């Protein structure tokens, strides 16, 4: 049985390699995750990530669903990022983000009126 440890970009990794039927199986532990090179992946709850992610309430979920139904998938992504506690600017180009804000926040009241009139016609 071979065992070793190494450090890469601030994370400590443990590596255990076993020879079984001439097929090496390597286990890697990434702090709270364990991944086997044989293709089997075992997930453990990552305490760090669960502390950073906010819970989304029902009203916020409704807004996301309404934007998806309206075909505004990019805006749904912005809402999902926002409500989860992430900054959308970190994931979306600045110009795109500003355009989405203008179309959905500033012009949102005008567009809602248009959608209501369209729903009546349909």
Curated annotation (Swiss-Prot):
In bacterial two-hybrid assays interacts robustly with itself, Asl1930, Alr2902 and HetR and weakly with HetP. In Nostoc filaments, approximately every 10th vegetative cell terminally differentiates into a heterocyst specialized for nitrogen fixation under nitrogen deficiency. An internal segment (residues 19-108) complements a hetP deletion for heterocyst formation but only partially restores nitrogenase activity; it does not bypass the requirement for heterocyst differentiation master regulator hetR. It comes from Nostoc sp. (strain PCC 7120 / SAG 25.82 / UTEX 2576). One of its GO terms (biological process) is heterocyst development. Belongs to the HetP family. Disruption phenotype: Single deletion, no change in heterocyst differentiation, in a double hetP-alr3234 deletion no heterocysts appear before 48 hours, by 120 hours only 3% heterocysts form. A triple asl1930-alr2902-alr3234 deletion makes 50% more heterocysts than wild-type (although they are not active for N(2) fixation), while a quadruple hetP-asl1930-alr2902-alr3234 deletion has delayed development but makes wild-type levels of N(2)-fixing heterocysts by 72 hours. This is HetP-like commitment protein Alr3234. It comes from the Bacteria. InterPro entries: HetP-like (IPR049598). Signal peptide: none annotated. Delays heterocyst differentiation and commitment when nitrogen is limiting. Interplay between the 4 HetP paralogs controls the timing of commitment to heterocyst formation and its duration. Epistatic analysis show that the 3 paralogs act upstream of hetP to delay commitment (asl1930, alr3234) or inhibit development (alr2902). Asl1930 and Alr3234 must also attenuate the activity of Alr2902. Ectopic expression does not complement a hetP deletion. The lineage of its organism: Bacteria, Bacillati, Cyanobacteriota, Cyanophyceae, Nostocales. The keyword Cell membrane does not apply. Induction: Transcription fluctates after nitrogen stepdown; down-regulated at 6 hours, rises by 12 hours, decreases at 18 hours and rises again by 24 hours. Keywords: Heterocyst. The keyword Iron does not apply.
């Amino acid at each position: 049985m071979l065992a070793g440890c190494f450090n890469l970009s601030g994370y400590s990794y443990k590596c255990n390699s076993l020879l079984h039927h001439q097929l090496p199986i390597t286990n890697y532990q990434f702090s709270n995750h364990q991944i086997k090179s044989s293709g089997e992946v075992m997930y453990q709850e990552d305490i760090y990530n669960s502390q950073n992610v906010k819970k989304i309430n029902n009203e916020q979920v409704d807004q996301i669903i309404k934007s998806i139904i309206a075909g505004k998938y990019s805006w749904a992504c912005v809402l999902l990022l926002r409500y989860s506690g992430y900054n959308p600017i970190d994931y979306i180009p600045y110009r795109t983000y500003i355009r989405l804000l203008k179309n959905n926040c500033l012009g949102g009241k005008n567009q809602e009126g248009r959608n209501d009139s369209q729903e009546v016609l349909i």
